[in-house]
Amino acid sequence: MTNNIHRPSRTALLLGFGGLIPFVGLSSLCIFTSGTHQQTLLFSLLAYGATIISFLGAIHWGLTMMESSPNSLRLVWGVIPSLAAWLSLIFNTQLGLAIQCLILWACFFVDLKTYPTFNLSAWLKMRFVLTLIASVSLFAPLAFNYIQ
């Protein structure tokens, strides 16, 4: 059996969508709790978001390693998401969650431009859905607390 990296495998789909469980679960719990428990859950959501954002940047290092002539700009971009995610942990939780929503979409738009270069356009549909659900999960507790 040949492994085609140009489109998501069943395993990639399962892991990608499985990775949404902490986003959706923590976000839902944040909405239905309050006080100290809610703050702990919000920070857990923020920490998980930072982890995923760091992974999204690291993908670009992997792509660059496949090139015969490494792209310096792609290497620089590869560390920007992790640095931005780290900064999001320094601010108050609500601001951090909003920043992470923006970072997730920035990562998606960079991928939208980068993936076709590597014949990986078939991954973009999954990336869009994952980004949409993850960003809504980060934003939902903010919106819910605002309307209360």
List each language-model region with its residue ranges:
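Hydrophobic alpha-helical transmembrane segments
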Residues: 29-30, 83-92
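Alpha-helical transmembrane segments and their membrane-interface exit regions
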Residues: 54, 102-114
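Juxtamembrane boundary at the C-terminal end of a transmembrane helix
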Residues: 140-148
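The first (N-terminal) embedded transmembrane alpha-helix
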Residues: 9-31, 132-137
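Core segments of alpha-helical transmembrane spans in multipass integral membrane proteins
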Residues: 17-24, 44-87
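Transmembrane helix-loop-helix
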Residues: 89-106, 148
